[in-house]
Curated annotation (Swiss-Prot):
Subcellular localization, as worded in the UniProt entry: Plastid, Chloroplast
Family: Belongs to the tRNA(Ile)-lysidine synthase family.
Domain remarks in the Swiss-Prot or TrEMBL record: The N-terminal region contains the highly conserved SGGXDS motif, predicted to be a P-loop motif involved in ATP binding.
Entry keyword set: ATP-binding, Chloroplast, Ligase, Nucleotide-binding, Plastid, tRNA processing
Top-level enzyme category: ligase
Source taxonomy: Eukaryota, Viridiplantae, Chlorophyta, core chlorophytes, Trebouxiophyceae
Biological role: Ligates lysine onto the cytidine present at position 34 of the AUA codon-specific tRNA(Ile) that contains the anticodon CAU, in an ATP-dependent manner. Cytidine is converted to lysidine, thus changing the amino acid specificity of the tRNA from methionine to isoleucine.
Binding site residues for ATP: S35, G36, G37, Q38, D39, S40
UniProt GO BP: tRNA modification
Entry-linked PANTHER family: TRNA(ILE)-LYSIDINE SYNTHASE-RELATED
Predominant location: plastid
GO cellular component: chloroplast
Keyword Plastid in record: yes
Name listed for the protein in its UniProt record: tRNA(Ile)-lysidine synthase, chloroplastic
Length: 504
């Protein structure tokens, strides 16, 4: 009994952590990715629980009772007792009644064609979704997925495409604390930056654009209607038009009673009379580089679609989830790909992490995640400071443009004063001729009367000064945020780090 109570309490903790996330209730319709393993199956059962608690609990109770009687075994009935244990918890019911409820849940499964057992997994998921009456999407890979990175990129593209088609913004994955630790170790061994090494990473939703042409073709040439990244021919076209316009003069009374903000409009009439004057006006305009064909073109590059990933099991270990699966006898499918040492992720999972646990610490995952949390805080602080410097740079550039365009007599130029102890940067107006020169870059002289095309030189000089004041760990991220063409600059990062003594 004690074991059952502890497992039910952990199950309730899982459900409370997922209920408190506001993303579930901001988006009524969720998309859950299922692979047949223990992590995805546990997250699926919790989402099914919330779905039926929000709709009607009596229907699922009758279905489960009939299923348990037909099976005549206590073990199969035991796997569905989590629904009743969760319903008895008052905190969950209070949170569900207050917030917006979950209305619909969809499943998606990606077939990689790595093992023959994946086809049995498809059959298992079909039975599971048929029993709970949940929509199910089955995605096949066109290309051969040799490496794990290519498979991960393919899954991201398929998820983003499904979310765009169904007009959703949230996908649920069964990622645990152990998965985040393994992912961070793999990124660390690849030599990643602190941005990708941190816990919070934005999902990439870029997909290849597709061109859809709604025309009738023969079956032999039907494949030409759907082509990826099709380039259209663009030419200059002149469109001429002509129309008849009738005019009527306004009377004095209308002018007197008219409001000051009245919009003048031309009067039109289908009748011919003395009051109206029929005139023909013709005109033409030039369309610069327009499309030659005006068929329906839909591109995914112009639309911005934000994707949010919901992870209800991210605060739990894989060991606790395996205990939960064994106690409730959840149906699973074992994939042999997770045990092959051809993939680097499996080497870290089965060799590297157990070896570190045996030698040093049993709580290696929690300690690593705490370190990642501190790295994430430092990275956010650096990004906020870079945004502040970007605002200062934009303020200096806009103020310079105002002085350059709106001064009637003389154009003034902002000179950067260096040599102060506090390294303060502020704009000053000088009447004397000053210039800014750097030996390693070779920037030309910037005088008092500077032209419009010399504004990028000023911006580059300001960025170089900011990078010389900052520490070495923040210079590279600042250059990426401020300079749009930082890859086209002739100098490298080491030369920029040595620019502290190069200012005059």
């Amino acid at each position: 009994m004690k074991k059952d109570s502890t497992i039910i309490s952990t199950c309730n903790e899982f459900s409370l952590s997922s209920v408190k996330t506001k993303r579930v209730y901001k988006n009524n319709h969720l998309l859950c990715s299922v692979s047949g393993g223990q992590d995805s199956i546990v997250s699926f059962f919790f989402l099914v629980n919330f779905l039926y608690l929000s709709k009607n609990f009596k229907l699922i109770k009758s279905k489960l009772s009939s299923f348990s009687v037909a099976s005549k075994s206590a073990e199969k009935k035991r796997c569905f007792d989590c629904f009743f244990s969760l319903k008895k918890n008052k905190k969950i019911n209070a949170l569900i009644n207050k917030e917006k409820k979950l209305s619909r849940l969809d499943l998606v499964f990606c077939q990689h064609f790595w093992q023959t057992q994946n086809f049995f997994c498809v059959e298992f998921l079909f039975q599971l979704t048929f029993f709970f009456d949940i929509p199910y999407t089955f995605v096949l890979s066109k290309n051969i997925l040799v490496s794990e990175n290519r498979a991960r990129g393919w899954r991201k593209k398929t998820f983003s495409r499904l979310l765009k088609i169904q007009k959703l913004s949230t996908i649920v994955t069964g990622q645990t604390k152990t998965d985040t630790a393994e992912k961070s170790i793999t990124n660390l061994l690849r030599g990643t930056s602190p941005k990708s090494f941190s816990l919070i990473t934005k999902a990439n939703s870029k997909t290849t654009s597709s061109f859809f042409c709604f025309r009738l073709f023969r079956p032999k040439t039907f494949y030409l209607t759907l082509t990826g990244n099709k380039r259209e021919r663009k030419v200059n076209r002149r469109i001429s038009f002509s129309f008849y316009r009738t005019q009527k003069k306004d009377s004095k009374k209308l002018r007197e009673t008219r409001a000051p903000f009245f919009i003048e409009m031309a009067s039109f009439s289908a009748f011919f009379g003395n009051t109206f004057q029929k005139k023909k006006s013709s005109n033409s305009f030039l369309l610069y580089k327009t499309r030659l064909s005006f068929s329906f073109c839909f591109s995914g590059e112009t639309r911005e679609h934000s994707i949010n990933s919901l992870k209800p099991l991210q605060n739990r270990n894989r060991y606790h989830i395996s205990k939960l699966v064994k106690f409730y006898k959840f149906p699973l499918t074992i994939d042999a790909t997770n045990f092959s040492l051809n993939f680097s992720r499996n080497k870290i999972r089965h060799l590297f992490i157990p070896f570190i646990r045996f030698l040093f610490k049993l709580k290696f995952e929690t300690l690593l995640l705490n370190f990642l949390y501190l790295v994430n805080l430092e990275h956010e602080q650096i990004e906020n400071e870079n945004l502040e410097l970007k605002r200062v740079l934009n303020f200096l550039r806009i103020n310079y443009l105002k002085k350059n365009f709106f001064s009637s007599n003389r154009r003034s130029f902002f000179v950067i004063q260096t040599g102060h102890k506090n390294n303060n940067v502020f704009p000053t107006k000088k009447k004397e001729k000053r210039w800014f020169y750097c030996n390693e870059i070779g920037i030309s002289k910037i005088r008092k009367q500077c032209k419009i095309h010399e504004d990028p030189i000023l911006e580059t000089s300001l960025v170089i000064y900011f990078t010389s004041v900052l520490t070495t760990s923040r210079k590279y991220s600042l250059l990426q945020n401020l300079l749009y063409n930082y890859r086209e600059i002739e100098i490298n990062f080491r030369q920029i780090s040595k620019l502290e003594n190069s200012f005059w």
